[in-house]
Structure formats: C-alpha cells, structure tokens
Amino acid sequence: MEGVRPLEENVGNAPRPRFERNKLLLVASVVQALGLLLCLTYVCQHSHAPEVSLQYPPIENIMTQLQILTSHECEEDSFILPLQKRDGTMEVQNNSVVIQCDGFYLLSLKGYFSQEVSISLHYRKGEEPFPILKKTKFANSNVVLKLGYKDKVYLNVTTDSASCKQLSVNAGELIVILQNPGGYCAP
C-alpha cells in the first residue's frame, strides 16, 4: 500500500490556525454592533422628534333639551318647540339651531309627549318642512339632511288638542351633529 498516506500525514486532519475562526467572530460582532447602533439611532431620532398634529376644526354639534311651553308660546294648535342648549359647539337663537358649516348633519329627536303630536323639521326658508313624526306620543327619530350655512333648524309641533297648554315633554332632546367636517364654515 504504497499509494495511501498514513493518517498523520493526511491534510484534512491537520490542525487549522485559530486566526480564521477569531476573525470570523470579530466580523460577526462588528456587524451586530453596527445593527444595534443603527436601531438605537432610529429610535432616538423618532422619540425626540416633535409630533406634528393635524389641526381639524371642532366638529359642529349641539345637544338641546326640549322645553315646556309657556302660555305666550302656545296660542294655536301649531307652534315652534322651544329649545335650550345643553352642550356642543353650535348655538341656539330664537328656538332654532343655527348652522355655520355646509355638510351632512345627523339630526336625532327623542322624547315622550303627554299627548299625540305631529312634528316637522324646518331648516331652510322656501323649502318644504321635513316630517319627522305623525300623530304619536313617543319620539325616537334619526334623519340625515344636507344643510348649509345660514340654515336654521327648528321643530314645528301640531296637536289635535283644543289647547297645547297641557302639552308637556319628558326627556326630550334634539341632537345635531355635522357628519363630514372640512366643508365651508362661517368664520
């Protein structure tokens, strides 16, 4: 067996220098350290950067309470239901909710009346009123209308009773909320 080398002389079993292994570990450690440094830099830059907040105008809304009629407000079988502001950014003037921004509005009417009433919603001069209730004591109605600047929302109530002076409202409220802010708003 002259062609076979003895095991000690085999090149595959020769000890390798430790320099290559140490060099590989050093390169891996440097790459890992650079990755960690890059992550820390990113986190530090974004945690100390001032946040830019978008400034949207407040959403137009109002919650009003339906009021009890006084004797001077109740002279006919048809009258405007008095409103009192409880909360919100919109205003009540002469028992009407004043619309300052163009857009779609959600109008919600809730309450219980002591006698049967028909309620229509008026919102623009020259336009037909929107009928909400027809001869009922309980109101739980929601409607979405396109309203514009200078519109005034008010409720007209009609009773079959000889006198509306006995009419009372329990837990009555009208809520008006702008659904799509960003359109034209009065300054």
Swiss-Prot record:
THD domain spans which residues?
Answer: 58-177
Enumerate the Cytoplasmic topological stretches: 1-23
Topology class, membrane: Single-pass type II membrane protein
Query: What does the record list as GO biological process?
Result: immune response; inflammatory response; positive regulation of cytokine production; positive regulation of T cell proliferation
Q: Cellular component terms, GO, for this chain's entry?
A: extracellular space; membrane
Give the glycosylated residues: 94, 156
Task: Name the predominant localization.
Answer: membrane
- GO terms for molecular function, please? cytokine activity; tumor necrosis factor receptor binding
Q: Which SUPFAM superfamilies match?
A: TNF-like (SSF49842)
Extracellular topological segments: 45-187
Keywords attached to this entry: Cytokine, Disulfide bond, Glycoprotein, Membrane, Signal-anchor, Transmembrane, Transmembrane helix
Listed as disulfide-bonded, the cysteine pairs are: 74-164, 101-185
Q: Could you confirm whether the keyword Repressor appears in this record? A: no
Output the SMART domains linked to this UniProt entry.
TNF
Compartments annotated for it: namely: Membrane
TM regions (residue ranges) = 24-44
Q: Describe the task this protein carries out.
A: Cytokine that binds to TNFRSF4. Co-stimulates T-cell proliferation and cytokine production.
Q: Which family does it belong to?
A: Belongs to the tumor necrosis factor family.
Q: Outline the subunit composition.
A: Homotrimer.
What is the protein's given name? Tumor necrosis factor ligand superfamily member 4
